[in-house]
Amino acid sequence: MRLNIFDVEHGACAILSDGYGKVSVIDCGHNATTGWLPGSYLRNQGITDVQGLIVTNYDEDHVSGIRNLFQQTNVHRIYRNMAVSPGLVRYIKSETGMGPGIDFLVSSAQQSSGYGTVGYADMGMHGIEFEVFHNLPSEFDDENNL
């Protein structure tokens, strides 16, 4: 197993590899200064399939490279906070403005009922298991904690 954490200035992006050719992406921010994008990076490494995209919160800097990730790779599943509906994200973001990455994520979530999970999840990666938890919208005022 290998975890690469990338410099995306503000935000987050990490790629988890099982050592057998399967990867998952934890957040998909990009680096505006260098032009680094997660999907282009993976494609340049010869990786075209992403087992899962794990979105840790609904801030733009955590998903600013999502469109590139979807354009350059086949993302099999998105794991996100399922307690937060796409409509609620749009409502919360109406106060501060919704960036293109969040808009893409919300649109993808609206088109698929099969994304996300709570509890133990199997991404089909050798030797890697993870458990998903989420915060409830009623417990927080901002999307950074959702």
Q: PLM features: residue spans?
A:
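Surface-exposed, flexible loop/turn segments at secondary-structure boundaries
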Residues: 61, 86, 138
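Core dinuclear metal-dependent hydrolase active-site scaffold
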Residues: 1-49, 109-146
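Metal-dependent catalytic neighborhoods of phosphoester/phosphodiester hydrolases
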Residues: 63-72, 88-98
